[in-house]
Amino acid sequence: MTFAIPSRQVSLELTLDKRYCGPYLTARLVNRQVEYMSTSGLSRARLGHMHDVMAGYVERGEVPGIVTLVCRRDEVHFDAIGTKMVGGRDPVRRDTIFRIASMTKPITAAATMILVEECKLRLDEPVDRLLPELADRKVLKRLDAPLEETVPAERPVTVRDLLTFRMGFGVVIAPPGTYPIQRAVSELLLFQGPPQPQAPPAPDEWLGRLGTLPLMHQPGAKWMYHTGSDVLGVLIARASGQPFETFLRERLFEPLLMKDTGFSVPAAHLDRMATSYWTNPATGAFELYDPAEAGQWSRPPAFPSGGGGLVSTVDDYLAFGRMMLNRGKYGNERILSKASVETMTTDQLTPEQKAVSGLVAGYFDSHGWGFGVSVVTRREDLAGSVGRFGWDGGLGTSWYSDPREDMVGILMTQRAWTSPNPPDVRSDFWTSAYQAIDD
């Protein structure tokens, strides 16, 4: 049969799949797939515009391939454009595997809350009981101080501090090596930059090295990105008595049917993995960051990073995004309590903490931070629906769930961000998704 959209006719192959978001129609074209909704309140013409905008990035050579998904009111629009590698012929598909980088952080936070619900962890408990390496912290007198110039921590680091990135240690917004503490982090292979799963040591050794360094700020004083999620991965393993990756698989990935999500890709599935690129700042050209075959995700890592180590597919992450949107339920199974999800997606930062924090100037004027997720607190653009929550991955991915619009959106590319400011493809995806709402 055919289905009309402005200036084009497409042949449709009808499918029915209730696993992720309910029934949908599938339109198959050369090197792309598009799914159109009937009752989602999304304009078909405007969805066509979103495809054209995304296709422009591939046609201009800015990314080799893009996968997008918008799910509203339990119906899906899916689009796959381009190829898995520069100059390649194998197209990106619905089951293409992507390195999701910091989109790992919300999953780590959800896993932590499972243990909080089971009373194996408590939000305001010091982490010293399970992480003695972080007991009796010292704190730098100032960020640029030598490592030996410290004062005692005013209080212990808590589980809540890790979830909200207020442990007093994290990414420093300054050129690498500017401060002694940055140089020490690099020398100890603690890694706060783009994911390098084969580089860090095993979890106990990693935490032991972290424990030799002073904190950068007093616990609870400032939001500092990233490190809290990596520490949570170690904490989850010790609190559960299982390896971190095993806990994620048994308590999240298997119940959510996230069969392609993990810290490495099995050899049999490497042909489905997209190649990862970064941008040479001098030339603006693509350069290889990680290949699929024999790359860093082709074998299990010594350190499964709770801050950025996972790979996934658009459908796998949709299952997680829908669970969060449904306040902890996936189908008939409850993964998290309603109270846990509401706590995770509530802004936890005080005005004083926001005033001295952030990756980008002004970010916390319209956003807050919950447990592992950003939360929109004030609308300032098309996509800034108040209450929308989610996070991005610096290797080229993005996810947000929007309770007000009953919508989940996911963008998957594999061209790394060049700065903390989001790339145009990410901004244009979210603008295009929200401009398509037509009710």
Annotated model-derived regions:
Residues 128-136:
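Acidic helix-start/capping segments at beta-turn-to-alpha-helix junctions
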Residues 39-100, 120-122, 137-148, 420, ...:
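Short, conserved catalytic-motif segment at the N-terminal edge
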Residues 8-9:
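Compositionally biased, intrinsically disordered low-complexity segments enriched in Pro/Arg/Gln/His
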Residues 78, 138-386:
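Short, surface-exposed loop or secondary-structure junction motifs
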Residues 48, 54, 74-76, 99-127, ...:
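Active-site SXXK
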Residues 396-404:
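Short, surface-exposed beta-strand/loop micro-motifs that present aromatic residues
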Residues 2-4, 15, 26-27:
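Ala/Thr-enriched low-complexity intrinsically disordered regions
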